[in-house]
């Protein structure tokens, strides 16, 4: 497939990365939905279970399609695919707000979280995740770093949420 067959970068990227992009976002959306389907009183006990499994699955999927994800992460500027992190941040923000509402209902309200700080922290979390892919380290090393990253962010969020 020659890049000269495409009138615009957007249509070239559409043919090269769309399927994997949509699947990747779908994995993340499914994890959010699966967590929200847990009975509310059980959600605090299972906070990391689904998200940990999802992050593992997303990392493995990205490594299975490494060239595609390198295109998305490093060369998609000017296409809709350049908004991967922003799209994931929006999904995570909604999930976080839904969970905060559950904590409130359970009588375990979190202190108010500044919306800008929340956005910065979530964006930082996804940037950290995607650095694992950008740097093309071994899968084993990336999986280890992901485990450490999750422990780091989970501890921080638990502190901020007063849990």
Protein language model annotation of sequence segments:
Residues 70-72:
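Short, hydrophobic secondary-structure boundary micro-motifs
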Residues 57-64, 77-105, 116-123:
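Amphipathic alpha-helical packing segments from all-alpha helical-bundle domains
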Residues 11-37, 49, 53-57, 83, ...:
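Alpha-helical structural segments
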Residues 41, 45-67, 123, 127, ...:
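Amphipathic alpha-helical segments that line or abut small-molecule/effector binding pockets
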